[in-house]
Amino acid sequence: GYELAVSQPRVIIKEVDGVKMEPFEEVTIDVPSQFQGAVIERLGARGFIMMNMVMHENQVRLMFEGPTRGLLGYKNQFIVDTKGEGILASRVLGFRPYAGDIQKRVVGSMISMIQGKALAFGLFGLQDRGQLYINPGAEVYEGMVVGNTSKGEEMTVNPTKGKQLTNMRASGSDDAITLVPPKLLSIEIGLEIMADDEFLEVTPKNVRLRKSKLTESERKKGSAK
């Protein structure tokens, strides 16, 4: 077998006559009109400016210009926001002055603190915090990203946590655990949702996200510098 570790895609930034430059693209989007608000909001946060809007019955065509890095990780979100009914096309406009900071990622990472096998009980306690990427029985290790947090903060978690056994066991208590189906990672989804300090691991059988620094102490040292 084989294993690859892939970092987040990055655009080429260059300097021309002392001015920081980056590639820009023109984006044309056709969507049902009920989804235009979500598209405009998402691309606006990613540094795109709407240049034109054309209405046609229940459809709308939106045209934007913005930095290429703002498109990285957006296409999967676009499918979600438009329920698969949108069409997106883009073309390169060339290099323009750097657009500044943009918002690409609004979720944080759930990071496993331990090596072992994920248990339903442990995952049940995490699913209200965000979206999981694994099923019960998945092998996890320290530094592996097992899900995301909806509030944007990073959280170190224990997906291997089991139910404490007692002498008095409630009848039917094991049947009370209901898990929401996880968002299983593919290469495409992983490349779009990964953070700057994460790697995408690809093997013949698995696609996983992990932190570049696996232990919490290493990550704290890196953030303190």
Question: What are the residue ranges of the model-derived segments?
Answer:
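Accessory interaction regions appended to the cores of large information-processing enzymes
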Residues: 1-225
